[in-house]
Amino acid sequence: MNIKRAKEEIEHTVKAYLAKDALGEYAIPAIRQRPILLMGPPGIGKTQIMEQAARECGVALVAYTITHHTRQSAVGLPFIRQRHYDGKDVSVTEYTMSEIIASVYARMEATGLKEGILFIDEINCVSETLAPTMLQFLQCKTFGNQAVPAGWVIVAAGNPPEYNKSVRDFDIVTLDRVRRMDIEPDLQVWKDYARAAHLHSAILSYLDLHPQNFYQINADVDGTQFVTARGWEDLSNLLDTYEALGLKADEALIRQYIQHEKIAEDFSAYLDLYYKYRDDYGVEEILAGQAKPAVFARLLNAPFDERLSLVSLLLSGLNNRFTASRRADAAADACYAFLREAKLGFATLPDDIPDGPATLFNQMMTDYDAETRHQREAGLLSRDALATRLKVYAVLRQWEAELRRAKAVGTQEAFDLLRTQFQSLSDERDAAQEAAASALEAAFDFMEQAFAESQEMVVFVTELTLAPAAHAFITENGCPRYFQYNKDLLLDHRKAALQQELAAEERRHGGM
């Protein structure tokens, strides 16, 4: 099973386990809600899909790496309590609440969400003293004498023994009480995530050329060398920041993330070439419709990996513009909705209240900011959604300052001022949309002149289809040449599939 399918299964499980019947009781009794056990190599994204699943299901998440805990923190600390049993006063041992269970209740209070996912990582790597506690947790959904609160779905994760020497095998009694999912690395599935997460285009381009270097764990006499999906993503974030700061990422830095000597060396060399191609070919000039004639001459003798790198650079530039357009559009839509609410609020104000509109606007802003903080704390905002809300709040602060500067007293006067401010934001949205559309047309002009209907054009159109930002932009704004090339590509695929079916049919008849 790949990581995408595992995420879907977790989301479906959360919805099923939290579904209620007509009486308000959980449709599946807690005793029949089997914990999910994810088994897969390290760095594949098990923890990350838990965050995504919780956010998309609108529930809370408490995540623990159990190897960081002792038996006392998992079960609770013992203390003596006096009891009266059968006419006798006796001293009995009881336990404080488990730190993990306490964290669940604390999360419920902090977020206001009463249902969620309790995720325990590295569950099969615990110490000998904690192993019985983990078995009890999976079998009975308790830590010590404290049960996991109702409405919380249990998900655990572990590594197969070939990746971790500390692994302890579960017995059949435990395995018969869980839903086990075995996860394997899958580059194509990871690339779908990487496109949506805006991972660095050099990494995606490199892995297109060297898919075998996506995920490796090799043990030799010098120790274990490895590269994981987590390593590529963390490196991507650093590369983006280094570029923004004007810093150079060398091989020594890359080795800190890609802890496989040959792959780190290979990617470092590719990254240097990638930046060189960006400068030599003038990618920004191409997207501005000003490609130099020398570029076409150079491409005639360029090797395939160089041509593919250039296509990747063009796609990266386009996706940056598509993302900017989408974010400008989202911010404008949110500000427009806020403006409509403000108009309704202004209608309730008497005209003679000093700073009435500005004061009301400030209160609405405060409520908006509080809602953002709450959703952020609850983990319900994606990176893009958070960026949009922060952008909107910054715009609203500017609008409030204009209201106070203009000393608008009348509600109509205040609304007219805000409407003027919104027009500037709307103009920014239109400019971002126009910049993206113009760059897309320039890119197609270049691709047609440089590559015509070659394999590079197939890659270009395919990536536009698969990249969420590109697909959304083209769907909303259109692009005749994209639709034509995409149609031709689909026809070619169908024709090839039909030819394969006919060939298979002929082989079957030939063998009779």
Language-model segment annotations:
Residues 10, 100-104, 242, 436-443:
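Generic hydrophobic, helix-prone segments enriched in Leu/Val/Ile
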Residues 8, 12, 16, 55, ...:
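Charged/polar, solvent-exposed surface patches and flexible loops
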Residues 1-212, 217-220:
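AAA+ P-loop NTPase catalytic core and its hallmark functional loops
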Residues 3, 20, 98, 102, ...:
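Short, structured coil/loop segments at alpha-helix boundaries
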Residues 196-359:
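Alpha-helical lid/collar subdomain of P-loop NTPases
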Residues 300-512:
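Terminal-proximal interaction/regulatory segments of ATP-powered molecular machines
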